[in-house]
């Protein structure tokens, strides 16, 4: 069965549901890795720091986080090469467990379905809860690679539902000159 639209899960309208020791059958996170680029480098080694900031309070499913991570990282690899000198980090982890009350459709569904009786729902995935103004991704790079980083983030925020801002947090004076 395919995923439901992000609009079903993007609003934070329920209390946090994260106690994994009480919950069975949680599917694994689709996020493959959280640190990309040059692992050994220290963020202080780079002159420029650029972040992708969410403009509203939202939940982002783990599939969307992975899709945006992949898109941004592939763009950086294409622009800078396999041994490109940058460091990228995904700052959010999908802790929130998402449930769905499955509904039967089609002929005879009224005899099979229970409607809203015992409607707690089955676990279908996880999501990250993100508040307004929090950073989802950060890239540390050199000034000549800043345009590639901005383009990577532009591609990344097309894969997630909330409006986002790309902010140069360090080294902005190097990009203007």
From Swiss-Prot:
Q: What GO CC terms are in its UniProt record? A: ribonucleoprotein complex; ribosome
Pfam families the UniProt entry points to: Ribosomal_L16 (PF00252)
Which InterPro entries would you find in this protein's record? Ribosomal_uL16 (IPR047873), Ribosomal_uL16_arc (IPR022981), Ribosomal_uL16_CS_euk_arc (IPR018255), Ribosomal_uL16_euk_arch (IPR001197), Ribosomal_uL16_sf (IPR036920)
Q: Which GO terms describe its molecular function?
A: structural constituent of ribosome
Which terms are listed as keywords in the entry?
A: Ribonucleoprotein, Ribosomal protein
| Domain of life of the source | Archaea
A GO BP entry = translation
Tell me which family the UniProt entry assigns to this protein: Belongs to the universal ribosomal protein uL16 family.
Q: Which PANTHER family match?
A: 60S RIBOSOMAL PROTEIN L10
For this entry, the protein name equals Large ribosomal subunit protein uL16
Origin species, per record, is: Natronomonas pharaonis (strain ATCC 35678 / DSM 2160 / CIP 103997 / JCM 8858 / NBRC 14720 / NCIMB 2260 / Gabara)
Name the lineage.
Answer: Archaea, Methanobacteriati, Methanobacteriota, Stenosarchaea group, Halobacteria
């Amino acid at each position: 069965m395919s995923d439901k639209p992000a609009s079903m899960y993007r609003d934070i309208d329920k209390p946090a549901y994260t106690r994994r020791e009480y919950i069975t059958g949680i599917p694994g996170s689709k996020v493959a890795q959280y640190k990309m680029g040059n692992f050994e480098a220290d963020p202080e080694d780079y002159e420029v720091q650029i972040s992708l900031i969410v403009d509203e309070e939202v939940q982002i499913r783990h599939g969307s986080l992975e899709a945006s991570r992949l898109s941004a990282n592939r763009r950086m690899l294409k622009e800078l090469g396999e041994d490109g000198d940058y460091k990228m980090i995904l700052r959010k982890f999908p802790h929130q467990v998402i449930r769905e009350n499955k509904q039967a459709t089609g002929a005879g569904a009224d005899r099979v379905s229970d409607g809203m009786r015992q409607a707690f729902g089955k676990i279908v995935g996880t999501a990250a809860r993100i508040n307004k103004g929090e950073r989802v991704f950060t890239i540390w790079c050199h000034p000549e690679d800043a345009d590639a980083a901005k383009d990577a983030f532009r591609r990344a925020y097309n894969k997630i539902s909330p409006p986002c801002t790309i902010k140069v947090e360090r080294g902005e004076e190097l990009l203007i000159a």
